[in-house]
C-alpha cells in the first residue's frame, strides 16, 4: 500500500475515533434506560440464564437475564432496566425484555428463518449422534456450544482447540486454509482456492451470519481471492482496506477479540512463511503449518484475553484440525440433505462419527496431561515488544 495513502487513512481513522469516543455516552451506575434493538448474535445459554450483548448509543451493554422466555437471533425486542456501570463496562441484570413491534424488515425476516433452520438441524444432529459427538459437530459447523458438557469444553480450552467450536474469525481463517490444502491434493490450485472461498461463504450462512463471522469472512475471501490472482500485495491491501472500512463504520470493534483474532490470524497466514520440512507431511503438515502461523500471529492476544496457553496446543491442533474441513463438508451436506430426506441426511452425518471419536480422543488425552501455562496480569509491554520482534524477524527473513 502506498505510504502516503496509508498515512492519510490512519489520519482519517484517528479523527473518526476521536469523534466516536467524544460523543460516546457514559452511563451512570443505576441509570434507568429503555431501548429497542435487534438481537444480532445468538444469546448464550449458561445454566438457567441467557447472556447477550446489545448496542445502545454506541455502547455495548452486557445483559444477563432469565433462560425463559427464550430469546433468539434476529428477535426485535424492547429492553428496560437499570445499568450497572463498573470498570467502564455496562451491565444489565434481569431487565424487562419484551417483543417489540416493527415494520416488515427483510433482513430480520431472513435472520429469523436462518435461526429456525438451525434449530431444526440441532434436533437432526442430536437424534443422529450420541453426546459429546453431536455437540462437537454442532460446534464445528454452527458454533453452538450450549449442549456441550462442561468437562469436554474445559478440555477443549486446555488444549487450545476451543476456537474450532467458537465460530470465530480465527476459525474462519483456519478452516479456509485447511479446505484449500485438502482440495489442492487433487485439484488445480485456483480451483481449490475458489472452493475455499465458497466454503467461507457457506460457513458464514450456517454460523448464522453474525457480525463477527461476516467480518472474518470478508477478510478470508479477500485473502483467498488475491491468492487466485497471485499477488500477495493485493491480499495485504485488501485486508487493510477491509479493516479500515470496518473500523470507520464501527470504531468500537477494535476492542472486539473476534476482530483482533481475525485480523492478526489472516496477516499471519499471509506473511509467516511455511516450514518446508513440515509441509512434506501432507495434509496434517499443512494443518500444523497453518496452526503455527496463526498462533504465532495471535499469541499475545490469546494470552492477554484468556490468560492461559497450552504447551501442547500446536501439536494438538495439528493432529485434529485436518479433520475440520472433512467434518464441515460431510456434516454440512448431511445437514442440508437431512432437511429434505432425513434418513439420508442422518447417514451422511453418521459418517462423521469415526473422525469425531478421533477428535475427542486427542482432545481428552492432551486435556488430561496438563501442561497449561497460566498468565495473570498480562503486560501490554510484552505485546508491543513481541510484535516489534516478529515484524523485524519477518523483514530480515524476507531479505535473505
What are these regions (language model features)?
Residues 7-163:
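Membrane-interface helix/helix-cap signal primarily in integral membrane proteins
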Residues 107-115, 135-146, 207-213, 232-238, ...:
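Hydrophobic alpha-helical transmembrane segments
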Residues 2-7, 12-15, 152-314, 377-400:
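Hydrophobic alpha-helical transmembrane segments in multi-pass membrane proteins
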Residues 37, 81, 140, 168, ...:
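Divalent metal-coordination and catalytic microenvironments
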Residues 17-24, 204, 306, 332, ...:
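Transmembrane helix-loop junctions and nearby membrane-interface residues
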Residues 2-5, 19, 46, 50, ...:
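C-terminal regulatory/interaction regions
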Residues 268-373:
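Alpha-helical transmembrane segments of multi-pass integral membrane proteins
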Residues 130-134, 149, 189-195, 323:
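Membrane-interfacial loop-to-helix junctions in multi-pass transporters
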Amino acid at each position: 500500500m502506498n505510504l502516503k495513502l496509508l498515512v492519510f487513512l490512519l489520519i482519517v481513522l484517528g479523527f473518526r475515533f476521536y469523534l466516536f469516543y467524544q460523543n460516546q455516552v457514559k452511563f451512570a451506575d443505576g441509570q434507568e434506560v429503555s431501548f429497542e434493538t435487534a438481537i444480532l448474535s445468538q444469546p448464550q445459554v449458561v445454566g438457567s440464564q441467557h447472556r447477550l450483548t446489545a448496542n445502545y448509543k454506541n455502547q455495548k451493554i452486557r445483559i444477563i437475564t432469565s433462560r425463559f422466555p427464550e430469546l433468539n437471533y434476529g428477535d426485535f425486542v424492547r429492553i428496560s432496566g437499570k445499568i450497572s456501570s463498573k470498570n467502564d463496562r455496562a451491565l444489565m441484570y434481569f431487565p424487562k425484555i419484551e417483543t417489540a413491534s416493527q415494520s416488515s424488515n427483510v433482513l430480520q425476516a431472513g435472520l429469523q428463518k436462518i435461526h429456525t433452520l438451525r434449530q431444526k438441524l440441532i434436533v437432526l444432529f442430536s437424534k443422529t449422534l450420541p453426546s459429546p459427538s453431536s455437540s462437537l459437530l454442532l460446534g464445528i459447523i454452527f458454533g453452538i456450544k450450549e449442549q456441550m458438557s462442561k468437562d469436554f469444553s474445559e478440555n477443549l480450552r486446555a488444549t487450545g482447540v476451543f476456537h474450532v467450536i467458537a465460530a470465530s474469525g480465527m476459525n474462519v481463517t483456519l478452516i479456509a486454509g485447511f479446505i484449500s490444502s485438502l482440495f489442492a491434493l487433487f485439484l488445480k490450485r485456483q480451483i481449490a482456492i475458489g472452493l475455499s472461498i465458497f466454503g467461507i461463504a457457506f460457513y458464514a450462512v450456517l454460523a448464522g451470519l453474525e457480525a463477527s463471522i461476516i467480518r472474518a469472512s470478508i477478510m478470508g475471501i479477500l485473502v483467498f481471492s488475491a491468492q487466485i490472482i497471485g499477488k500477495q500485495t493485493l491480499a495485504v491491501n485488501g485486508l487493510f482496506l477491509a479493516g479500515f472500512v470496518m473500523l470507520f463504520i464501527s470504531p468500537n470493534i477494535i476492542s472486539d477479540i473476534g476482530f483482533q483474532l481475525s485480523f492478526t490470524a489472516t496477516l499471519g497466514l499471509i506473511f509467516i512463511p511455511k516450514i518446508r520440512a513440515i509441509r512434506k507431511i501432507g495434509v496434517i503438515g499443512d494443518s500444523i503449518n497453518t496452526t503455527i502461523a496463526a498462533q504465532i500471529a495471535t499469541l499475545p492476544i490469546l494470552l492477554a484475553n484468556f490468560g492461559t496457553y497450552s504447551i501442547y496446543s500446536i501439536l494438538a491442533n495439528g493432529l485434529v484440525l485436518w479433520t475440520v474441513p472433512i467434518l464441515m463438508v460431510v456434516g454440512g451436506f448431511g445437514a442440508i440433505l437431512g432437511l429434505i430426506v432425513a434418513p439420508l441426511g442422518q447417514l451422511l452425518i453418521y459418517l462423521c462419527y469415526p473422525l469425531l471419536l478421533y477428535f475427542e480422543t486427542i482432545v481428552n488425552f492432551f486435556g488430561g496431561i496438563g501442561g497449561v501455562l497460566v498468565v495473570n496480569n498480562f503486560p501490554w509491554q510484552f505485546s508491543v515488544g513481541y510484535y516489534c520482534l516478529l515484524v523485524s524477524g519477518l523483514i530480515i527473513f524476507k531479505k535473505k
